[in-house]
Amino acid sequence: MLAIAMIRCWYDYWRERPGTGRRVSSGGAKIIFSDTNTHHRGEENYRRSGVTDPMRIEKDAFFAHQVMWNGWVDTEEDNTYIIGHWNYPANTVKPVYVVSTGEEVELFLNSQSLGKGKREYNFLFTFDNVAFKAGKLEAVSYNKAGKEISRYAVSTVGEPAGLKLTTIQNPEGFHADGADLALI
């Protein structure tokens, strides 16, 4: 998973950050500068990986980055994020990854504790062999004293009931001039 690979890379920058009290790093710049009409690259130059998709819709790595790099030099706000969704076929067993600023993270499935995760790279907590069961998957983070500092939950979605498309347009409306774009 891309988000997990990025956490491992970002941790190296986070661990080695100078403690000057000033922002010394962007936490990893997420921009690529290039001339898209050079060397026959064209539109294929746009990256398919990263923290957002081409329409700037956030991916898991975006939220992992927010947990890790939410302050200046040190983390200022505690936060927790479960990587991925909780919608799987019956009998699925998989690892669950949680990004957290806490010292410990406990995972709950439908209010039943699944135990505490294995900590890696200071922010990444792994829960191996979690059996899928429809409902609410919740991660609760604790500080050194065992006090809850943050939580995050994902839930299984039900069957779709319908689809509603809503346009967002500029004040002048849509124009069939070849310049407007509708994403569906």
Residue positions per predicted region:
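Proline-centered linker/hinge motifs at extracellular inter-domain junctions
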Residues: 161-163
